Amino acid sequence: LQSKTESGLPYIVLREAIVNAFIHRSYKVNSPVQIIRYSNRIEITNAGYSLKSIESIGEPGSLARNPHIAAIFHDTNLAETKGTGIKSMRKLLMKSDMMPPTFESSHAANTFTLRLLLHHLINEKDHHWLMKFDAFLLSDNQKTALIFLREVGALDNLSYRQLTGVNILQSSMDLRKMVSSEILQQKGNSKKNTYYVPGKIFLASLEVHQQE
């Protein structure tokens, strides 16, 4: 098997993401695991919200919804050691200079989504685009978030923390700064439904970049 897909995504990362969906999905819900390949990302959605909090995904310890299925994947070496799969994915993506995975878990919809961006960390074109924000003295974490927002279209506090590894206090400060600078526009007014979309400055930078 090839070590990487055509997009440069490590094969093991994609395999682990798919296996993870089958190990942790809810089989009480009669719906297939959905694997959607967009031009810039892969999203894998399975029935069943995460039994672990999103913040603790990737930390030691595993809560398998289907232990017998998990055992089969582990015994056949199709899955990493219990509780280490996400951690291994992050390491491999970092080694390949790609963004870390992001996750969404919904109790209401009873679904879990894992997202893999097919984008290498800030390349030459990205650097050129990000120069348009130099006046705002953005951190590397904020710049990474802007690349994510450009590729996906929306960003929330949780996604920011998953991308950067900062705590909730720092992520809130970073996002507020970009909102006050009109780089981002805030939508929603509560912790559960607040997210961010491109603001006036962000949209203007894209228009200029496309004309160059």
Where are these regions (language model features)?
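C-terminal regulatory or interaction extensions
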Residues: L1-E212
